[in-house]
Each structure stands twice: as structure tokens, then as C-alpha cells.
Amino acid sequence: METIFAQSSAFGKAGVAVFRISGPKSLEVLQLLTGRKDFKPRLMYYQQIISPETNELIDNAMVVYFKLPNSFTGEDVVEIHTHGSKAISIMLINTLLNIDDIRLAEAGEFTKRAFLNNKFDLTAAEGIADLINAETIMQHRQAVRQANGGLEELYNNWRNQLLKIIALLEAYLDFPDEDIPDSILNDVNNTHKNIVNEISNYLNDNRRGELLNNGLKLAIIGPPNTGKSSLLNFLMQRNIAIVSNIAGTTRDIIEGHLDIGGYPIILQDTAGIRAESTDIIEREGIKRAINSAKTANIKIIMFDAEKLDLSINNDIIDLIDENTIVIINKIDLIEPSQIFPIEKKYKCLRVSVKNNIALSSILKNIENIAENIAGFTETPYITNQRHRHYLKQALSHLMAFNLDNDLVLATEDMRMTARCIGLITGVINVEEILNEIFKNFCIGK
């Protein structure tokens, strides 16, 4: 196995930069850079880092040696903690590149080696990637659970039950003359039925985990000049949308990313929806607004309190569902006692975006809907499409399983089911899958 290295911290100015070396020559490289031979594992040392070629001092650093298998990768590992200077990073990287039998690591190669050395399964490796990319508290919680074996335990439980079924069926095939109690086949059928139900229910999760990973789309829609762009600017705490009294100012979808209550929200301000527009570009914007609303996880429908009765049309009303927040804006311009017909049918929030009236209620409603859609629960959810793909394949093999037909075919269905789940956890190793997963890591991880 080659020895690899990379800067694990971000390149640039910082208090500390961390370099990681992994492989059989790690300790030898550390000894070469420091001129010191006696390094005890897991102890930090304050050492000068010197170029072996020029004898030039690169930096005074803290270094530590991890002896295999007690390291992240399961190999001999060295970490060098220097000052976070671009010049130091460049000098140390060039120095390491000039040492024989050591090369720059590929993206995700340290984590890939840890997986190959059985430090964790493939779902945990993906959890580490999600943890690195997590931007909100809820994404962090989901990633931590997965990185610490939450999904591995679930999938391995199913696979172990399947392996027991396979063992029983193979024994039945290998010793056909032996009397095998009917109770064993009944147990096989019952276990099969339970796994079918569990995987079916697990797949029927409305993609909660994937939505939490990728972000929930929130579309702000409504008639022109109701304050949609002003609301977007308020939520983003900066002006990313043009605000104007001229109808049709927003013609395309404007997008921003936000953390509301720990949930990743992708905000979309859309063109005002009105039936009478003759402008070709505006009509295309209206079409996109409606399509955006139809695919959104959360919708905010805004109306102008002064023009509410005139602005309601079926294109807008038809979009209202349980994940919709109906807002009546500009309430400072009407009498508080005024009640609109739409308020009798739907729960509406009365706000004034311009004067910052009741805007906190919008944030709370968004958070409540996001929690209902993708809230963190005790049961770990499917977090990416790869898992869903193989679970669907596993379920199709389970549905084909039938002990009343050919027992050989039934056994093969069980093998294929176990294989699909093994592909998720990495028990069954396919190089193409590994390359696809680990290429999404940053270099140094």
C-alpha cells in the first residue's frame, strides 16, 4: 500500500494547518522531516520541520504518530500541525512531494482506506461526508447518527436475518432426504414477511432523510406586488430581489439558502401570478412560478390586504395544501376588524413585511412544517438515492420469493436480497460504487 499525504485543513490563512500522512512510510517521513527517531504513539511533540533537501526550516510544529491499527485509516498515520500560512503549506507540500514513495492523496482516499481496513461500513463513510457538508443543526444530527453506525445497525440486522434464511434453505437443498420440521419453513415465511413489511415501511418515508440532506424547497407565490420579494429579502437578511411598485418586476425565479430552526431551506421568489398578462416573458415567469409551487415542499402564498378580493384566482387557490402558509400582507393599511372570506376557509397570517409586524410568526410556521416533513426521529432514515435504489431492488427480490415454487429459485431470491443490502453497507465490495462515493470527499479526508 502506498503512503499518501494531504493537507486536511482548508488551504489559506488560519491559526493552524493540519497535514495528514498515512501508510507504511509515515513514521519514516516524520523522522526524516524532524531528525528525531523516537516517537511514541499518540503523544504530541513540539518539533522543527526541516526540508531534507535544503536543510531550511519550514516551521515549528506539533506532530503526532498513530501506530496501526489505532488510527483513522487503520494504517500508520502521522499528523503535522503547522501555522496556517499559505507559504508554509506550499513549502511542506513541495517537500513531501520530493520524498520517494509518497504521493498526494486523492479525494476521499483517507476515508476509503479506513473503510477498506474495516474501521466502519460504507453508510458510516457517507455519514462522514454528510457531516463535513452539514450546514444546519438537523443535518448535523442526521449525519452524526449515520457516521456512528445508525444505518449500519439497521441494514446489518436485515442482512443477518436473510443469511439465516439462506442457511436453512441451503440445508434443506443439501439434505433433501432429511425430515425438516414444518416449523422451520414457517419460521422462514414469517421472517420473510416481517422483512418485507419493514423494508416497505422504511421506503415509504416521503424521502425525509434525503430532503434534510439536500434542503427543503420553499416557494413564495402570489399575485404581483403583494410583497413577495420584500419577504424574501427579510428572510435572507439582505437585498437579493428587486422591490418595485411596478407589476411584473420579478419575472424569473430568485433563489436563496437559509437555515430556519436547524432545517435547510431553499427559498424561491417567483413571478406574480395574474391571469391578464399579455407580456410573453412575464407569462413564462408565471408558468415557472406555478411549476415551482407544484414541486415545492413548502409554499408561502401572499396576498395584498388592500387588493385581496380582486387578486384571488383558481391558479393560486388550487396550490394550497397542508404545507402552505397563507399570508395577508400590508395589514397596517386596513382596519383590524376587517375579515376576508379567505380567512374563513384557511388559516391566514396577518403581517406587514414593510413595518416588521408579526414576521416571527412566518418563521415559526416554516419551522413547524419543516419539522413535520423532515423532522429528526428515533428511526434513522434513508439519506441518499443509492440506498433507496438497492432497497427497492432488495424488495423486488423479496416479493418474488415463494417457497411453494422452486426452492432453488426461492433461495436465489434470498441471496440477491442479501446482496443488495450488502452493496449498501459495503460488505459486498464493488469498485465502481466506492469510486463514486469517495470522489465526493474533499482532498485530505
From Swiss-Prot:
Residues annotated as binding (6S)-5-formyl-5,6,7,8-tetrahydrofolate: 20, 79, 119, 445
Annotated SUPFAM superfamilies: P-loop containing nucleoside triphosphate hydrolases, TrmE connector domain
Residues where Mg(2+) binds: 229, 250
Domain TrmE-type G: 215-371
Enzyme class: hydrolase
Required cofactor names: K(+)
EC assignment: 3.6.-.-
UniProt GO cellular component terms: cytoplasm
Pfam family, one: TrmE_N
Chain residues that bind GTP: 225-230, 244-250, 269-272
Residue numbers binding K(+): 225, 244, 246, 249
Keyword terms of this UniProt record: Cytoplasm, GTP-binding, Hydrolase, Magnesium, Metal-binding, Nucleotide-binding, Potassium, tRNA processing
NCBIfam families: mnmE_trmE_thdF, PRK05291.1-3, small_GTP
Assembly notes: Homodimer. Heterotetramer of two MnmE and two MnmG subunits.
Protein name, UniProt field: tRNA modification GTPase MnmE
